[in-house]
């Protein structure tokens, strides 16, 4: 049909010919009337891709000769495909033996350093464990924890999960990425009923990094119904994210609204004194003695990055034990000698173009590949321009070098960077681009940044 073909040609310009051929032209046109187009996909995964990437474009661009929107209905061919009973059973077994979030026993409340900055989330999560022991309902639901990388969100989540499980509460702990993987597996194997039972027949659901669902319409739809089912039955939902609910990008408003139903709690990274106290406690447990100025040196050398410091102390403890120095006070010279390789590696850690691309992609809720890709869709063009601007600003790379990173000629790079500069020169601090640059600059320069954003 003509309208569908015109739509496909438009998409070739936005997302590329190869993508259209793979995902859209392979859809079979079953039937068309004035306002309805019926398509058949080869499998459920193609249906999911259509819903997440194309559905919103159809609503905006596909119209008939009378200017009325055409409703597109996509069904899956594999719904009617026969399977052998043994094959079905194998798929069920494979899907439901997937891991679903083991917790680290060391991540307990007892091992968490409570400071004035993070006292509130600790007290609330501990109180919830007590409430569950008494068989009472949860006073705030959901609990939404948000804060930068290395602020302790995972530690708090796992500590709370451990406490609830000890109290006999059936608790499921997953990352948003794992939730998405489970959903895709369920769709592909026709096991949505079992998927829903798996996620809803619990008393508490803990889900990390909810921003991973950004831009994934079909996954958000399923999580919306999962959330509603649990909340209606008074079951606890605990969510973590780098962003406050209102700052989530490409997330449905109805989900954001529900995230704000209960209580949203910021989780702050340890300030320097708190970090030092935390590390002093850790050295006692590891049975090593470090002179105060030597510990200050180590904190400075590793840029106050908590995970790097914990790794360094664990390595130091092993080497101290090997050299039988457990009772000896360690000074800066000893630290430099015993951790020479660790400190040398830390010096080589630097911000890179690929690190900027990953950080920008995460901020906008898209993949790094799409930022580096050829699509001219606005949802990818803007992150690409922002990443180019940051490469120029933060790394002082030449236009030619940036062009090599993004597989573009230098004139395209110049125009992209100029476009972002012009938006910033408008002096509107509330504009989306200005907020993006400010937030990404903060993340990339923060002493508590995640090593996901840097490479050695």
Curated annotation (Swiss-Prot):
| UniProt keyword NAD, yes or no | no
Q: Which PROSITE patterns match?
A: DNAA (PS01008)
Q: What induces it?
A: In infected human monocytes transcripts are present by day 1 post-infection and last for the 7 days of the experiment. In patients with confirmed synovial Chlamydia infections, 7/8 had transcripts for dnaA1. In infected human Hep-2 cells, transcripts are visible from 11-48 hours post-infection.
Instruction: Report residues binding ATP.
Output: 150, 152-154
| Annotated stretches, region: Domain I, interacts with DnaA modulators | 1-68
Database matches in Pfam families: Bac_DnaA, Bac_DnaA_C
According to the record, the residues making up region (Domain II) are 68-101
What terms describe the molecular function in GO for this protein? Answer: ATP binding; ATP hydrolysis activity; DNA replication origin binding; lipid binding
Region annotated Domain III, AAA+ region, chain positions:
102-320
The biological process GO terms on file are: DNA replication; DNA replication initiation; regulation of DNA replication
For region Domain IV, binds dsDNA, the annotated ranges are 321-456
Q: Tell me which Gene3D superfamilies the record gives.
A: 1.10.1750.10, 3.30.300.180, P-loop containing nucleotide triphosphate hydrolases (3.40.50.300)
Q: Hey, which family's this protein in?
A: Belongs to the DnaA family.
Function per UniProt: Plays an essential role in the initiation and regulation of chromosomal replication. ATP-DnaA binds to the origin of replication (oriC) to initiate formation of the DNA replication initiation complex once per cell cycle. Binds the DnaA box (a 9 base pair repeat at the origin) and separates the double-stranded (ds)DNA. Forms a right-handed helical filament on oriC DNA; dsDNA binds to the exterior of the filament while single-stranded (ss)DNA is stabiized in the filament's interior.
Quaternary assembly:
Oligomerizes as a right-handed, spiral filament on DNA at oriC.
Question: What protein am I looking at?
Answer: Chromosomal replication initiator protein DnaA 1
Q: Name the encoding gene, please.
A: dnaA1
